[in-house]
Design a protein with these regions (language model features):
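Thiol-/selenol-based redox modules, centered on thioredoxin-like
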Residues: 259-316
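Structural beta-sheet core signal
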Residues: 97, 214-216, 259
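Short active-site neighborhood of thiol/selenol oxidoreductases, capturing the structured segment around
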Residues: 166-198, 213-215
Length: 316
């Protein structure tokens, strides 16, 4: 869990490029104090001079993002919108800030990874004056991927071609939960994930009971070469190929997994196979405990009924 740093004015004079806000004593909860810091973070910053030192700007943005961890989400998004509105007056400055935001919120090494927070910076970078064609294309791809695969959003209804050549829509499938596995047949890490998931007793038990469906999607065409490569994939998985998914899905973390509910809403992503297996084990154990408790209560009810029936029988 990330800690929010509260900094005294004396410390700020020597450690920061400008004076950070100090929450009033009337704000006592962590969320309220964090929200105040986020809302007023840039109040004393000279927006012209801060960009003269990239090091100072990076450190300031690092602190800014760290305060967001416990802040109110509406306050956070409003603060980002106001910041972008101010910085966007200069195209080069906006591109610099978008680049730093990408490193701190979106990249593989991002300390505060957050798709929701990065998205407005990506949009601002894509529309900044002076942005190159290459930069704009890169931002637009990230925007498309993120907007279509945010947690809490409906997963795109892509067309799937199965091993037998039949074509279906992703949203055609019914079930309680879905594990979408974006597969690359020749990749070693993907192969290891397939082996672990296909041999996991907990997941297979949930599949058999109809609790979870695994949909394994290879981005690309469903040609004969693909069919040969996936011929030995688990028969209790829905194995498909789908074109155009690279534009729709965020696949920074590979192997890529998405976990959906029955309405095809994304519950989680950037999952790891080992963590999935542990989660499925816990779900299965929980279901077993519930089933055992129901059976115990049922047996107790039957015993009580038998006792009542015996008491109601007339004595000879």
């Amino acid at each position: 869990m990330l800690a929010v740093r509260f900094i005294s004015p004396a410390q700020q004079q020597y450690e920061h490029a400008f004076m950070y806000p100090v929450p009033p004593e009337s704000l006592v909860t962590l969320q309220d104090r964090s929200s105040y810091l986020v809302e007023h973070f840039w109040d004393r910053c000279n927006m012209k001079s801060i960009f003269s030192s990239r090091k100072n700007l990076e450190q300031s943005m690092d602190d800014y993002f760290s305060f967001m961890v416990y802040a109110d989400s509406a306050v956070v998004m409003n603060s980002i919108d106001r910041l972008i509105k101010e910085v966007k007056k200069s195209g080069p400055n906006m591109l610099t800030m978008a680049e730093i935001a990408r490193a701190k919120l979106y990249s593989d090494s991002a300390e505060y990874r957050s798709d929701e927070l990065y998205l407005p910076f990506a949009k601002a970078g894509a529309s900044a004056s002076g942005v190159s064609k290459e930069q704009k294309a890169a931002y637009q791809l990230e925007i498309s991927q993120l907007e279509n695969s945010l947690v809490g959003k409906y997963v795109p209804d892509v067309s799937l071609t199965l091993r037998d050549g039949s074509v279906h829509r992703l949203h055609d499938y019914n079930g309680n939960y879905f594990l979408i596995f974006f597969d690359e047949p020749d990749d070693f890490d993907n192969m290891m994930a397939r082996v672990k998931l296909s041999t996991d007793y907990g997941l297979n038990d949930l599949i058999t009971k109809g609790q979870v469906q695994v949909i394994c999607i290879t981005p690309g065409k469903a040609d004969d070469e693909w069919k040969a490569r996936v011929a030995d994939y688990p028969q209790n998985w829905i194995v498909a190929a789908a074109e155009g998914t690279d534009q729709l899905f965020d696949r920074r973390v590979k192997p890529s997994f998405y976990y959906l509910n029955r309405d095809k809403i994304i519950l989680s992503k950037t999952l790891v196979a080992d963590n999935l297996i542990e989660a499925f084990r816990m779900v299965r154990n929980s279901q077993n405990r519930i089933r055992e408790e129901r059976e115990r209560l049922k047996q107790e009810a039957l015993k009580q009924r038998e006792m009542l029936q015996k008491q109601e029988q007339p004595m000879n």
